[in-house]
Amino acid sequence: MNEALQFIRKAILSRLTDAISIGGSYVPVYNRVPSDASEPYIRVFSVSNNESDFNGTSFISECVTRLEVVTAFDSDSGGELQSNQIVSSILNLVRTRSSGYYDLSSDGFNVITCTNNGVTYFEDDLEDKTYFRAIVEISNKIEKI
């Protein structure tokens, strides 16, 4: 059995890069956020890979990936609308039906399901800025082929 999360993360990064724009500018997508990054941005990271179905012919795993949306505004301006809009775009691109699943066949995997496990919103009112964050959790059931 092989680790599929790296391929899922790569597929998500590829699908989202230069695909979501706010105010005429593309929202950057990172796995590792650089120190000079400015908001808004999206961070994609792996959470877990658990074997889910046990049968004699194939390995099936449930792979969970999170996408964190980070926006920020001066303390007395802006709001969470921008994070809502970015989350909506993410879900339209990532949470698809079977015809839109990632093609991982060249990596030896087949995507069986894609599920939105939920979106959680946070607001952090700090001295310099107010940060609006959203965590999108996506679960993919993956078959080793």
Residue locations for each model-derived region?
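Short, charge-patterned binding micro-sites
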Residues: S35
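Charged, amphipathic alpha-helical segments and their flanking helix caps
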Residues: M1-V27, R32, V47-I145
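A short, hydrophobic beta-strand-centered structural micro-motif
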Residues: S38-N49
